[in-house]
Amino acid sequence: MTIRTTHVGSLPRTPELIEANRARREGSLGDADFTSLLQDQVDGVVKRQAEIGLDIVNDGEYGHAMIDAVDYGAWWTYSFSRFGGLSFEDVQRFDVRPPAGRDGRLSFSSFAERRDWQRFADAYADPDSGIHIANRNPIAFPTITGELTYIGAEAVERDIAGTKHALEAVGKPVSDGFVAAISPGSAARVANAFYEDDEAVVWACADVLREEYKRITDAGLTVQIDAPDIAEGWDQMNPEPSVEDYRAFSRVRIDALNHALEGIDPDLVRFHVCWGSWHGPHTTDIAFKDIVDLALLVNANGLTFEAANARHAHEWTIWRDIELPEGKYLIPGVVSHSTNVVEHPELVAQRIRQFADIVGDERVVASTDCGLGGRIYPSIAWAKLEALAQGARLASK
């Protein structure tokens, strides 16, 4: 059989879309004109995915606004405009500390206190290092000051309608489309001045996000739950916790997500695990084997995860010892967002076969490690997707 292909969601924004996002934020572009331009852009990005040969496609997350070509956080910050109960202040987001843990339990440190960033502080502070992220401009960052509510219906319906319109234009069924949405655990990593503790925030986020997930799946599209907090969150705890305590912390987030997904067909859900999108050493990442069973507890039949970058490419072997639950399938990353080197199609094919030879061709969908938009130069990102499609064809022979 032919092994199917997809990607994790975020694709490079065009200069026209970035400028339109800026104009809309400044109030010089009205909603009707913006929606028309956005639809044209979504039609174009879906068409390009189809022309490359990708099977399961999306809107490039074009509805998750970016006003700069380089943006590692649009997958998260898009949610700020879809939650009621937030107040905003211009701050350096890396210094914000998420909600405190319940009864002295684990909680996240600030982004700036990440163990990876602390260990390699000289590199992160050096503009010539290639991983410099310091001195970013302040952004309007949210604090929870009231009961969280969902105010994103119009925005998510635009995402849904745009994706379905573009799928129809290229002759693809709705079942070949997906829309990305944030997990409760990731959405909860904002400042809190209302709820009792971090767990209360996570459960409140789950109640809010249920509406977004349900609208996407009710439309026949697959929802991809972006949950880097499950893996990447380990590094944001300083000092390093025990694996046992971290698993208990993460289990709360899994349970809250399953609450949000209650009643939704798992066939229409895929769960994305990653160790963060920043281009750094990642020596403090948690091993996939320590959390993979938690990821498999999610009521999602698809599991997407990093498997191509240099820190995690070796972990494909864990699947030799895991019995994949009935109905579930793997969506491994076989090209990476962490390097500008475009993977050779034969290497891509080898990586695909590593998984397919263990679980079967029909239970593998080849993908990217993470989103490419805002992280990889556009022409390189598209070349990586071409290599992905070519590699899948080779692996299917």
Language model segments and positions:
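Domain-level signal for soluble alpha/beta catalytic cores
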Residues: M1-K397
